[in-house]
Amino acid sequence: MAWQFNSHEAVFVQIATRLRGEIVRGTYAPGAQFPSVRQLALEAAVNPNTMQKALCCLEEEGLLYTKGTIGRFVTSDTAVLDAARERVRRDSVRSWLRQAEELGISKQELIQYIQKEDETV
């Protein structure tokens, strides 16, 4: 699936957000080798420098680490993965709340919508 980017946020931030989500969802297993910068840049159709910047962000967060010249790997540290999972969840909820506010939906109405949709899922 083609990667899509918006103009409201730096592309490397959007890439880091997407990859962070994929890591915490288990798309990339703890301890597994991560795809190369070049491979990911081709997949996302971005400059390798942009991808490198995004991956450096994930390294700073401790989600990825580099093993010499072998490449990057996903952390096996459950505390780091749990903290990242919580961050992804929190950011998602904040995004929903901002969108609801922009649409004039109160928090109570949002809760009602969620409960109603939950019944249909």
Can you annotate each of these PLM segments?
Residues 1-33, 39, 87-121:
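Extreme N-terminal segment that seeds HTH/winged-HTH DNA-binding domains in transcriptional regulators
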Residues 24, 29, 60, 66-69:
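Short glycine/serine/threonine-biased micro-segments
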Residues 33-65:
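N-terminal helix-turn-helix
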Residues 34, 66-74, 78:
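Short, Lys/Arg-rich nucleic-acid/phosphate-binding segment
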Residues 42, 77-78, 119-120:
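Short Asp/Glu-rich motifs
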Residues 66, 85-88:
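Short amphipathic alpha-helical interaction segments
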Residues 79-84:
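Terminal helix-turn-helix DNA-binding modules in bacterial transcription factors
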